[in-house]
């Protein structure tokens, strides 16, 4: 028979330490990615000593993980100026600026990897789907041939759009739960549009 939690806290000497550790956790901002998800996404990105970009960057955890993977140059396109400043201050050697994920100042075929994060708490709207389509179009423009795309998003936000996108081939889809919603990490690579089936 298992004792209830209150009895365990009263009786066990390690309970005080457990409660102290529980209270010490930093509350995450809404829409922030967990560090383990960021590490997995950075691993799938296979950046190496090349250039990478993050579209729709809302926090510093993903840029820090990608930078730690040994990327040469990292560019983050953020939805607001405050996030861009935060990333530049926390992740050294990273270029971050406010802008649209669908229209960047990156040169054609200049990136080996592009990562995208769609916050899972956002409501699915026509605008969200349109923004994702524009971001994927921009991604194909800035990626070098056979470049890699990593998308982190809720299934209901991105699955149908990613399936219909031309010029990319899905290498793998890895399910996970983010903020209580079914989500996934999609790993894709660019292909010539005429090679598609």
Stretch-by-stretch model annotation:
Residues 1-28:
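Non-catalytic substrate-recognition/targeting regions of SAM-dependent transferases
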Residues 59-72:
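Conserved SAM-binding loop of SAM-dependent methyltransferases across substrates and taxa
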Residues 73-78:
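Conserved SAM-binding motif I beta-strand of class I
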Residues 92-101:
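Conserved SAM-binding strand-loop segment of SAM-dependent methyltransferases
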Residues 102-115:
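A short acidic, Gly/Pro-enriched loop at the edge of an enzyme's catalytic core
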Residues 148-197:
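C-terminal catalytic and target-recognition region of SAM-dependent MTase-like enzymes
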């Amino acid at each position: 028979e298992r004792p209830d939690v209150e009895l365990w806290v009263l009786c066990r000497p390690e309970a005080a330490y457990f409660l102290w550790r529980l209270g010490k956790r930093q509350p995450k901002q809404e829409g922030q990615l967990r560090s383990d998800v960021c590490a997995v996404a950075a691993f799938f990105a296979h950046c190496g000593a090349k250039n990478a970009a993050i579209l729709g960057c809302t926090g510093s955890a993903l840029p820090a993980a990608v930078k730690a993977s040994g990327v040469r140059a990292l560019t983050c396109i953020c939805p607001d100026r405050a996030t861009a400043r935060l990333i530049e201050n926390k992740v050294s050697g990273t270029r971050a600026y406010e802008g649209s994920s669908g229209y960047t100042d990156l040169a054609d075929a200049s990136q080996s990897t592009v990562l995208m994060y769609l916050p899972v708490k956002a409501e699915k709207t026509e605008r969200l789907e349109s923004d994702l389509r524009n971001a994927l179009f921009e991604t194909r423009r800035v990626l070098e041939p056979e470049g890699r795309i990593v998308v982190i998003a809720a299934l209901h936000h991105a699955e149908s759009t990613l399936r219909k996108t031309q010029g990319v081939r899905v290498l793998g889809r890895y399910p996970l739960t983010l903020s209580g919603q079914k989500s996934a990490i999609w790993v894709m690579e660019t292909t010539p549009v005429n090679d598609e089936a």
